């Protein structure tokens, strides 16, 4: 459950943003590792596509665009790759979740916020 993941981050790190809801890239990586998964920060679009083609889910910190309005960032999970598109799971919206999106659009809307990218990038392969 998302609440259990949030609790893991909140109880074990200082990376939980309780004022604006959410966590940093460091918090996400902590949770991935705490649940027994390995992680790889993806720094190029080619790496992102390769991870998705190999069947690995990807944690994605995104900026303004499809998933979040101006002056904010948001986290989604990407999975699968077909015909230049990937499926997004959005914990904040039943409208945007479960749909396929152009990989170029996702890449171009990646977060550049240091809170999200202090781990080296905005995308993290899980597993």
Where are these regions (language model features)?
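Noncatalytic regulatory segments and standalone regulatory/sensor domains
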Residues: 81-127
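Active-site-adjacent substructure of cysteine-protease-like catalytic cores
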Residues: 41-93
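Short linear motifs in intrinsically disordered
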Residues: 17-21, 48-50, 79, 113
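Sec/Tat-exported extracytoplasmic proteins
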Residues: 13, 32-36, 52, 56, ...
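Stable alpha-helical elements in mature extracytoplasmic
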Residues: 5, 24-31, 44-48, 74, ...
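Generic structural signal for short, flexible, solvent-exposed coil/loop and linker residues
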Residues: 26-28, 37, 47-49, 67, ...
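Cysteine-nucleophile protease catalytic domains, especially the papain-like/related folds used
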Residues: 1-40, 119-127
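Detector for Asparagine
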Residues: 11-12, 17, 33, 71, ...
């Amino acid at each position: 459950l998302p609440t259990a993941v949030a609790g893991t981050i909140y109880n074990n790190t200082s990376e939980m943003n309780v004022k604006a809801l959410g966590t940093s890239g460091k918090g996400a990586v902590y949770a991935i590792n705490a649940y027994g998964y390995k992680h790889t920060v993806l720094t190029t679009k080619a790496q992102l596509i390769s991870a998705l083609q190999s069947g690995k889910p990807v944690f994605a910190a995104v900026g303004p665009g499809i998933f979040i309005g101006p002056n904010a960032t948001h986290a989604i999970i990407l999975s699968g790759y077909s015909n230049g598109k990937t499926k997004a799971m959005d914990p904040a919206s039943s409208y945007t979740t479960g749909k396929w999106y152009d990989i170029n659009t996702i890449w171009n809307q990646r977060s550049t916020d240091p809170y999200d990218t202090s781990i080296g990038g905005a995308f993290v392969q899980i597993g």
